[in-house]
Amino acid sequence: MKVHIHTKFCLICLLTFIFHHCNHCHEDHDHGPEELHRHHRGMTESESSKFSVQDAENEKKYYIEKLFDRYGENGRLSFFGLEKLLTNLGLGEIKVVEINHEDLGHDHVSHLDILAVQEGKHFHSHTHQHFHNHLNAENHTTTSVTSKRNHKCDPEKEAAELPIKADDKHLHDRNHRFHHRHRLHHHLDHNTTRHVHNDSVAHSEHGEPGHSPSPETNKTQEQSEVKSVKVRRKEKGKRKKENSEVNTPGFLPNHDHSEQYEHNRVHKLDRVHSPGHPHAHLPEHSGHELGHGHQELDPDNEGELRHTRKREAPHVRKSAIYSTPSHKDQSEDDRQHECLNVTQLLKHFGLGPNSPISPDLFTYLCPALLYQIDSRLCIEHFDKLLVEDLNKDKTLVPEDKTNIGASAWICGIISITVISLLSLLGVILVPIINQGCFKFLLTFLVALAVGTMSGDALLHLLPHSQGGHDHSHQHTHGHGHSHGHESKEFLEEYDAVLKGLVALGGIYLLFIIEHCIRMFKHYKQQRGKQKWFMKQSTEESTIGRKLSDHKLNSTPDADWLQLKPLAGTDDSVVSEDRLNETELTDLEAQQESPPKNYLGVEEEKIMDHSHSDGLHTIHEHEVHVTSHNHHDEDKAVLRKHSHQWHHRHAHHSHGPCHSGSDLKETGIANIAWMVIMGDGIHNFSDGLAIGAAFSAGLTGGISTSIAVFCHELPHELGDFAVLLKAGMTVKQAIVYNLLSAMMAYIGMLIGTAVGQYANNITLWIFAITAGMFLYVALVDMLPEMLHGDGDHEEHGFCPVGQFILQNLGLLFGFAIMLVIALYEDKIVFDIQF
């Protein structure tokens, strides 16, 4: 019995000696770094454990400063800086992956790599070779680390490999966790730079006690903590060991989440597709639940993992603390599958777009960013989007299809009704507005109609007919790209709209040129007439008297007998009229040909009757030439102007624009048919466009209705002005306008039916409607702007003022349609019936 007890005692001593010898080797290996750490820090082991929180704060400040130096300004992160950061992380907007990447994996980094290839930021020449090269480099590093770990008890080898041990362990851990993943070149370069910085920190800590600790210091602290954990595990068991890990100041339970944060800071390396770790692909795990990923590893690797994650521990603690009250909100966002942009992210934290973000506030945003990265809400696959759209169309319940169709019909009818009610506005405005003001207003509104209709055709309908826009879903456009990339995306997205804008510019340029030429000719003619009138008014009296004296002296007495006035021409008023007209005709004849001595009787018979009447008045003028005074000459000048105004007015009335008397002579029935046919065709095209747009989507229907609404107001006012000018009553004008509005309902019904049951024809309807709009704008209304009404000039209407109003109307119409074309996709209406 005593022998057995002695034997057991010897075995216990032997085991104790062996264990003590191994621990002595381990302590000898750690003695140099510990003494170096105590020499530089002047602290005991307990003091360094207490100081780890301060080191963590320094590490947090260091990385936040790096981020703020890159994306911020003056120690603050602006809205655009945060937006750029989210874009580099792959957040802020939904990005569609269009390239097949089965060989690269489906992790977040692979998605970002594919998006970089799509955007031209990165290229892959040989994907598989590139992938294996990374694996070979990592496996080589792993081999060296493994061999180094197998010779832990050799102090010389470990002392030689000490400067690069932290770096090798980083790479070993990443190789162990990410050996099934493709990674980018610049990611490895960035991590290498970070490790070099860590080495420099270790050498520069002599004069900077407040900076981050060196990797050697972290290693010493961690190994002492690992040793204490092993002793407690032998003494108290596995349960005590887990409790001691929770109380260790390295913040170990959440180390996997901290690794995720450090990688997400660069390229969102959050999770892995690894056959050996199937639990790593669980999207429902939150930040603190990701820490169980390496509990199956052996104790030796556990110590290295703890050392590797020592630098990221402060971020985990901050994230865990700050994310605790908002965990419920994050789970709700996960159920909603919402990709938050910068504005939404700041709004959830009670901040505005103009609020600068301090480093302390940024620590509150980090958990939300990690959650967005982990849930991958901002990455979609192109093939999945297509499948979802097809499945959505196929899986629609017949009741849902009926509701969608009913909403298109109801919205179309409401839109046409609202637009048709503009006729009542015309009824109210036309009688109230003064005639002079109405002419100014109508000139502006006609130009506005031309601008809106031509702009709607070239900027909205034709781009839609070419498939440039799609109203069936909302487009999201990010703003976090560089200016060059933004301009490139803008040019590609709105290529058809910009080409239509160039076409409008050509129309406007020719309009300006033609209008300027007409104004120049008008002022030139006006100046010539004024000079001629002034010259004739000064020389009229003297030339007339000389000519009359010459005729009296050269005409024989026999001829005077044949030039007696007719009976009834003694009236003074008639004689004055005849006198002035004859005097003007004689003056014109004398300027063209040399004066004749006399006119014989036979020649007088051959002359026109108007000239014979003039000869009678000439005789009367010669008999009473001495009795006329200057007052009579003034009357002659006034009569002359009246005669020439009448002649010019008659000439203008034969132009394309008719006066009120001409419209009355045409007949109310003809005017009514003209309005019904012209305005009806226009309204039919409006209804066709509105119906087709509402059948394609509610947003497109609203934007098209706004476009029609803008150019329908001047059109309706012009129609009422024409009808009332033709002599119609207000009731008749309302009836005829309602008849023309019925064509809009017919067009809307046809457009909606075709859009609902024949989707391929919708684009052709847009093209036909664009042609109708161009015809009405450029053929019917633009000539009226160019030629105008002759009455305007005679009532003091200035051509320069008319030109300015027309330019304002055209440019305003173009601007309205351009704004609608650029921002129609951002108009969202969720109306369900």
UniProtKB/Swiss-Prot annotation:
UniProt-listed Pfam families: Zip
UniProt modified residues of type Phosphothreonine: 538, 555
Signal sequence coordinates: 1-25
Organs and tissues of expression: Expressed in the liver, kidney and brain.
Modified residues (Phosphoserine): 593
Gene Ontology molecular function terms on file: protein tyrosine phosphatase activator activity; zinc ion transmembrane transporter activity
Main localization, broad class: membrane
UniProt keyword Transcription present: no
rRNA processing is among the record's keywords: no
Record InterPro entries: ZIP, ZIP_Transporter
Protein name: Zinc transporter ZIP10
Organism: Mus musculus (Mouse)
Organism phylogeny: Eukaryota, Metazoa, Chordata, Craniata, Vertebrata
